[in-house]
């Protein structure tokens, strides 16, 4: 009974906040600046998030000036339509060092940044977990739907990016990702377009957990896969759950990719349900002669389905309204010449 009352109160507060914005939206702030030197509205990113109005009527933009922001941040689900714009990807860094097993932390609470607000956009930001090779340690946990990351970096080791949300869709464009074991994992539909992906140890790049009935899981389009010099045994992926779906299309693959390409996670039954595909990859690791027999080589006709519109509509006959991901085709956000404290 008490729990029911609690959820009713939370709902009422959310509705009240939303109605308040409708009545007088001009009273709310839609542009914030965070700066370590005190020249912005806030010194800490989480303080700026906490000051944002929920369910805004217009996108909220958070400009983040160069600096190392040593903090664990969370953008809740009711903070929709938020944009994080960094001053420069190399110098705008959000970092923390939690990991699974540290105190009461699990894999899913070890993140540096958790993004749950739908229609989130990030540009020119580094998300890092500096815990080191100590087990699962997320740089990013994103379960927001229609989230776009452009020109960002994701630094970590095991489980760098958790692409969460069974029905969520996420797009990474021109990003840099690094890690060791299963460093891109989760159940969402996520596209990595023209990204650079670096494997730091003998490991598995992906561990998809695609939901039953979904046509697409992780899709890599025109990416470059790198491997450190000591890496000699690298798999494209293994199925975290039985219906994992992952495709590498027109990607550059390093010599470290094992001939079979894919791993069944020690369970032959996964070979009957997982969907692993490739098309016109290149490089020393792209030879498909000895690929796992249960993996798929796409045809020219089949690869036509691998467009953003089709992927993000789950192959539906009626294409997804692509306004949320087409924004990447427009000119990048411009850092304001003067960002003054308001």
Residue ranges and their predicted role:
Residues 22-342:
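Sequence-level preference for short, compositionally simple segments enriched
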Residues 1-25:
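Bacterial Sec-dependent N-terminal signal peptides
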